[in-house]
Amino acid sequence: MSNRIQTLKEAKRIVVKIGSAVLTTAEGINLGLICRLADQLATLHERGVDIVLVSSGAVAAGRNSIPSGAKLDDLPARQAASAIGQSRLMHEYDETFRRFGLVTSQVLLTRDDLKHRDRFLNARNTLSRLLEWRVIPIINENDTVAVQELEFGDNDTLASLILNVVEADLFINLTSADGVFDKNPDKNPDAKPLACIENIHDLDLDAMCDGKTAVGSGGMFSKMRAANRAAQLGVPTLILAGKDRMIIERIFNGEERGTWIVPDEKSVSRRKYWLAYHCDPAGDLVIDDGAQKALLSGGKSLLPAGIIEVDGKFKAGELVRVVNKEGKSLAVGLSCYNSTDIIKIMGCKSCEIESILGKCPYPEAIHRDNLLLDAAL
């Protein structure tokens, strides 16, 4: 655990994510919790640490102000509740943080904002300037305008992308659970807490995480997936019980609580990280055993010869998933060809592409520079 203590001491830019299940009660926003959160983040801020807060809670905050009998069972209803709740949530954040001498800013994003490289860079520049000004950005999904196919799905996913945007060196995820367990503690009384996870990629997340919170859109699976992504980026994750009193202050004072997830020794480039996670894959490429070995052990590009099946329709330049014959996900990457052309050239040597398509702009189906292995989808 000494590495954990040292990393906490050396952290200069932290992304803190707080979920709806922590932030709200049946009556609405938990004002006492926001006050304690502001107090703890102010202490870190005074030490010179940059803080970025990814906050859920807008829909839950607006729930009590919708008409009696109205249900939040479709996207327009959730968007309307979010529009009500977001302003109330930010008002409470602004008022509370100001009492501790902190200035906050509201940043609302959609997945489309991070999908396009120019808008991604614009978001990065804006957040960088806010942090230079010692302002605390409070980030949430822009639920009111997000369409279903471009939703982040949950703020754990959003937070995992923000780690890359702001170049954070620590990720703290405040949840309703007291860290990570070897299996779902709600269903298994003998579940054991995990104080430290050395290699998150070796875990069977589907078996460990089979439930979600009542008021949130995510669950432990989404939190572990976000931690998996953070590990690839070289960022450690700390999953804590957000309702534990002054929990952030206590762990920075050396108390060992929650679950510490160790990052990969060799991190991926920020560009590859963005390529892999800016949107969902548009299709699958099924590859043979030889291609699988070349990818996993040789760091090679994916050649058409190793592809045995194409699933889905996609354009050249779109993100696709690479799977083996058993359906296991191996990687994601940008396809050099559209799905129609891939079907024509799969199983063929690269030297045969021109005779089949009439042109050969690329000898590979996915170049290794545009390929991320073990993507946490």
Swiss-Prot record:
**Domain PUA, chain residue ranges per copy:** 282-360
Major localization class: cytoplasm
Biological process, per Gene Ontology: L-proline biosynthetic process
- Report the pathway entry: Amino-acid biosynthesis; L-proline biosynthesis; L-glutamate 5-semialdehyde from L-glutamate: step 1/2
Q: Which SMART domains has this protein been placed in? A: PUA (SM00359)
Keyword presence, Iron-sulfur: no
Reactions catalysed: L-glutamate + ATP = L-glutamyl 5-phosphate + ADP
Q: What is this protein called?
A: Glutamate 5-kinase
Question: Which organism is this entry from?
Answer: Maridesulfovibrio salexigens (strain ATCC 14822 / DSM 2638 / NCIMB 8403 / VKM B-1763) (Desulfovibrio salexigens)
